[in-house]
């Protein structure tokens, strides 16, 4: 009845479908929100009585279907053929702005939609307006909850099966997917991803544009512009110290070390893994350095471009236990 009424009104030209109500919504906006897909199709200029796919899609685009979590509409849109290597430009879909359809599905924990998009041709390596892959966006969800583990691992497998190249840059800093996962290792999704990627042959020594390895990113690696203030009293940043590490990070470090992580690699500013560990936090730093020692002989006297050793950084942070530990090898 509602559809027939809407059709007659449109045919009679009694209203302008682009008119807005007092809160700025068009008839199509309301049809989208209320799930009136046949009316939505009609308002978008389609004929839902003769076109089955348009009746299901309701005039929605792929981002709108994801926003309203309408799987029937999404399926119809995909069956009708749609470009999936694109980004959302709709200001109304604020949480999707600038993201790809796959990234939108992953960031909203819509595993079913993510898999359908992948099977329909979404490119896992496509980068959005901020040069992030869908995986990079997904990591920022910082998922917790062990009940999600199998779902996450299933999606990681789907990404691989659908052409994902995790060794490719996943962001504008040139980080691989493993490096980004290491940055998010304080959360279960990051931990699961690190283990999965290493088990599937990820390069544990791949460096980003700053020369940071996955292990360095695990221990607080972050973007740094290299700026050092002229006066020591002025605030400054460092390439390390990007996250507060804990004793639990040693488990992930061990995974990287067992896979052959280079313990003497240096970033573009001369910092080694020991510099990063010393700059990360006081929790677990001593244990992490001890673990590194178990896998080789790192150069504890290595100095960065500012002339600092890991011991110097530990001293600046008043990490007494790490200072005492490093002095044994000085």
Each predicted region: which residue ranges?
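Intrinsically disordered, low-complexity repeat tracts
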Residues: 1-2, 8-12, 22-23, 29-33, ...
């Amino acid at each position: 009845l509602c559809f027939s009424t809407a059709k007659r009104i449109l045919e009679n030209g009694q209203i302008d479908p682009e008119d807005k109500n007092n809160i700025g919504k068009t008839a199509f906006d309301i049809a989208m929100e209320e799930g009136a897909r046949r009316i939505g199709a009609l308002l978008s200029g389609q004929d839902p009585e003769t076109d089955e796919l348009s009746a299901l899609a309701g005039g929605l685009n792929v981002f709108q279907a994801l926003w309203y979590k309408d799987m029937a509409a999404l399926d119809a849109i995909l069956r009708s053929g749609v470009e999936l290597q694109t980004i959302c430009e709709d200001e109304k879909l604020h949480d999707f702005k600038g993201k790809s359809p796959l990234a939108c599905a992953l960031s909203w924990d819509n595993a079913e939609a993510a898999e359908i998009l992948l099977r329909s041709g979404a490119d896992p390596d496509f980068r959005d307006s901020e040069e992030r892959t869908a995986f990079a966006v997904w990591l920022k969800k910082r998922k917790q909850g062990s009940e999600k583990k199998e779902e996450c691992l299933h999606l990681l497998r789907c990404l691989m099966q659908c052409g994902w190249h995790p060794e490719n840059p996943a962001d504008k800093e040139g980080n691989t997917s493993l490096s980004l996962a290491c940055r998010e290792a304080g959360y279960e999704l990051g931990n699961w991803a690190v283990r999965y990627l290493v088990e599937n042959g990820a390069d544990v020594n791949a460096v980003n544009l700053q020369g940071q390895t996955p292990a360095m990113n695990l221990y607080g690696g972050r973007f740094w512009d290299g700026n050092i203030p002229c006066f020591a009293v002025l605030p400054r940043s460092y390439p390390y110290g990007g996250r507060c590490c804990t004793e639990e990070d040693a488990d992930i470090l061990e995974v990287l070390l067992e896979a052959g992580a280079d313990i003497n690699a240096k970033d573009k500013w001369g910092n080694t893994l020991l510099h990063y560990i010393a700059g990360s936090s006081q929790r677990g730093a001593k244990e992490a350095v001890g673990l590194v020692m178990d896998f080789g002989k790192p150069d504890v006297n290595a100095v960065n471009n500012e002339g600092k050793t890991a011991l110097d950084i530990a001293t600046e942070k008043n990490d007494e236990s790490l200072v005492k530990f490093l002095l044994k090898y000085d």
